[in-house]
């Protein structure tokens, strides 16, 4: 516990069968691929990329357990436990903490127009119940929740709120957060903006495409930190070509198809997501070949 949490993480994909059940063997393969093949520093488990909000509580626990079994103590593990049901978030947080996850993360409560005080207390309640470190998951495009610099300050006053997963295009706010809180962890959540985020001083990044493009992301991150911006941007252009094509075909089914191409039992997306559209097969094959995926 309490490892240095800086670095690059796969936002772990989760394979499902045709009945929407977790494929445990495939999940272990996906986790091991992220660490052994993509050479990432850790896993961010049960986030958006794991289709978390389509899972019941027992399935979420199953994913936490299997991911931990797959990689053990070799890498850093962050458990996303956020839920509209605070009791579930606490239950999941306790479970992940008992499994040995290095930190918790929680998406801001969404759908209902919660006040900041309600959002703040949601985080404080999870921390009090689990006594684990917390990383705020800020993703306003999906939650509709925008946290101001003043509100970040109030959250960061809690010693166990150690950082933020920042998935937002507002680089002015990112710069303000970095300047105001130099000792807090900032992990970028936008794969397509890794160069810009690194220049802005983030400590690492969490990405869904890092499941298949992690080595290229590592080069981008390292080059940008070394001031080799032109070289980093060239690789970012390549990554964004990959991302743009993947998004056009459906992100989760397409990433799973790339993993399947590697011999990994990557399963299906969970309904109502649809499986990979075979009409895109030629485009996918060309993408894999061109970018050595």
Swiss-Prot record:
Q: Which Gene Ontology cellular-component terms appear in the entry?
A: cytosol
Query: Which pathway is this protein assigned to?
Result: Amino-sugar metabolism; N-acetylneuraminate degradation; D-fructose 6-phosphate from N-acetylneuraminate: step 1/5
- Tell me, in one coarse class, where this protein mainly resides: cytoplasm
Q: Which InterPro entries match?
A: Aldolase_TIM (IPR013785), DapA-like (IPR002220), NanA (IPR005264), Schiff_base-form_aldolases_AS (IPR020625)
- Describe the reaction catalysed, as an equation: aceneuramate = aldehydo-N-acetyl-D-mannosamine + pyruvate
What SUPFAM superfamilies does the record point to? Aldolase
The superkingdom listed in its UniProt entry is Bacteria
On subunit structure and binding partners, the annotation says: Homotetramer.
Protein function? Catalyzes the reversible aldol cleavage of N-acetylneuraminic acid (sialic acid; Neu5Ac) to form pyruvate and N-acetylmannosamine (ManNAc) via a Schiff base intermediate. In vitro, catalyzes the reaction between fluoropyruvate and ManNAc, albeit much less efficiently than with pyruvate as donor, leading to the synthesis of fluorinated analogs of N-acetylneuraminic acid. Variants are useful catalysts of reactions between fluoropyruvate and unnatural aldehyde substrates.
- This chain belongs to the protein called N-acetylneuraminate lyase
């Amino acid at each position: 516990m309490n490892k240095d949490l800086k670095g690059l993480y796969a936002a772990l994909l989760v394979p499902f069968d045709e009945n929407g059940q977790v494929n445990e063997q495939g999940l272990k393969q996906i986790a091991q691929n992220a660490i052994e093949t993509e050479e990432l520093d850790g896993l961010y488990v049960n986030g958006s990329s794991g289709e978390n909000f389509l899972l019941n509580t027992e399935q979420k626990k199953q994913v936490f357990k299997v991911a931990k079994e797959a990689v053990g103590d070799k890498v850093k593990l962050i458990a996303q436990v956020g839920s509209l049901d605070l009791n579930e978030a606490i239950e999941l947080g306790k479970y992940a903490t008992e499994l040995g996850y290095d930190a918790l993360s929680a998406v801001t409560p969404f759908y209902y127009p919660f006040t900041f005080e309600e959002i703040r207390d949601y985080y404080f309640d999870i921390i009090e119940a689990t006594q684990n470190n917390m990383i705020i998951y800020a993703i306003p495009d999906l939650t509709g929740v925008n946290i101001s610099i003043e509100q970040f300050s109030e959250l960061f006053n809690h010693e166990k709120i150690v950082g933020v997963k920042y998935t937002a295009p507002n680089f002015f706010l990112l710069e303000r957060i970095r300047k105001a809180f130099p000792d807090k962890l900032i992990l970028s959540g936008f794969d397509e903006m890794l160069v810009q985020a690194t220049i802005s001083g983030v400590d690492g990044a969490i990405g869904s495409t890092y499941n298949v493009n992690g080595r290229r992301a590592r080069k981008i991150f390292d080059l940008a930190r070394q001031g080799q911006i032109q070289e980093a941007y060239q690789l970012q252009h390549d990554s964004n070509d990959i991302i743009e094509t993947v998004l056009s075909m459906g992100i989760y089914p397409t990433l799973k198809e790339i993993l399947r191409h590697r011999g990994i039992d990557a399963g299906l997306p969970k309904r109502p997501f649809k499986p990979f559209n075979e009409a895109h097969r030629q485009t996918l094959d060309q993408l894999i070949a061109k970018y050595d995926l």
